[in-house]
Amino acid sequence: MQLTLERSGYATLNIDYQSRRGTLETLAENIRPAIELFVSGLSNSVHFVGHSMGGLLARVYLARYRPEQLGRVVMLGTPNGGSEIADRLKNISAYRAFFGPAGQQLGTQRDSAIAALFPPVDYPVGIIAGDRSIDPIASAFLPKPHDGRVSVANTRLDGMADHVVIATAHPWLMRNSLAIEQTIAFLRDGRFRR
């Protein structure tokens, strides 16, 4: 994804964040300096592309620190409506250890504090969902269609500008050539190609 975006003329910042070491609020604070430094060197629109929890992290970040020159946002396999897998596994110690505090915020039933992290979007958001699974165990917990981690229904978001479903599984969304093409189309045109 990053290389193709760069070849298409976009400057990129690929942030490696410690997703298991804090809440979404803490993670938003942690990525803030890198984003602010990157944005300070740009004169044009700043777009965000996030995969899975990265899309939720972008929403939390933008609710708190939205750059003036915000352009468009693309989310790939992001559990905007929560994750049924998180609902089932959140009380299991192995899940808590693997997904950390942010993993506890991924459920479909959100209390008012978690819901407050995700105010309505008022910027252009395009969402790419997958509808294939490579994980038969996770598939048992998810309503169809799904990508093996997130149901297509829970990728949707009130106020989104566009939504597209492609034939791939959750882990491959960021490397799928069609997902990459659709990401660039949305960043450029504000809509996906049909």
Model-derived segments and spans:
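Histidine-bearing beta->alpha loop at or near hydrolase active sites
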Residues: Y17-G22, A167-P171
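Serine-dependent carboxylesterase/thioesterase catalytic core
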Residues: Q2-S8, T12-I15, L24-D122
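C-terminal catalytic-base region of ester-bond hydrolases, centering on the histidine
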Residues: P120-R194
